[in-house]
Amino acid sequence: MCAGTRGGDDLVQITISGHPGSGTSTLVHLLCDRRGWRSLNGGDVFRAEAAGRGLPLEEFSRLCRDEPEVDRALDDRLRLEMQAESGPEVIESRLAGWWAHQLGLDCIKLWLEVSPAERSRRILEREGGELSAALERMNERMAADALRYDLLYSISLADMSPYNLQMNTDSMQPDEVADAVEAALESQGD
């Protein structure tokens, strides 16, 4: 069941999820450029809220951990956008596929899988620094996020049941990933 339509199109065409460094943001930019779609990035919502409160990301993450209602309010905002008639066609966040699944949205729910070594390499390329430090930060963030998702929603990121498309992109270039996703969108009859 779709939440609704806009000009005959489903509101949300695709949710894109994956661990940090998996290429979700790159894919979103490519799809939006190719199709003229709009997107909403859960990380951007998180960063904007942190900035609005005058807090660095690490401190805002602690606030979300200590005050779960703050984190829930951000996720509620994403869920509302997913159902809004004027909402974007692409939603990017680690839990977007879960929200679409729970809301019964008829869209592609994509999970990008990438090995820890490749994610670390990509993060290092993007942010610079030392590989060991990048790995440590990535592992700490993933552990903290996994705990938070479990405590808030009883969701395990290891559970892929909400996702109707999973892609391992270790050896794929960004355009190859976008081409494969566009083929999936076409086969679904976007």
Name each model feature, range by range:
Residues 105-127, 136-139:
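Conserved phosphate-donor/acceptor-positioning beta-strand/loop module used by diverse small-molecule
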Residues 42-102, 116-118, 128-133, 143-145:
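ATP-dependent small-molecule kinase phosphotransfer cores
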Residues 27:
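Hydrophobic positions on the alpha1 helix immediately C-terminal to the Walker A/P-loop
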Residues 19:
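P-loop (Walker A) phosphate-binding loop of NTP-binding proteins
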Residues 98, 131-180:
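Small-molecule kinase domains that catalyze NTP-dependent phosphoryl transfer to phosphate-bearing small molecules
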Residues 33-40:
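Post-Walker A helix-loop "phosphate-sensing" segment adjacent to the P-loop in P-loop NTPases
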Residues 23:
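Conserved glycine(s) of the Walker
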Residues 16:
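Hydrophobic anchor at the beta1->P-loop junction of P-loop NTPases
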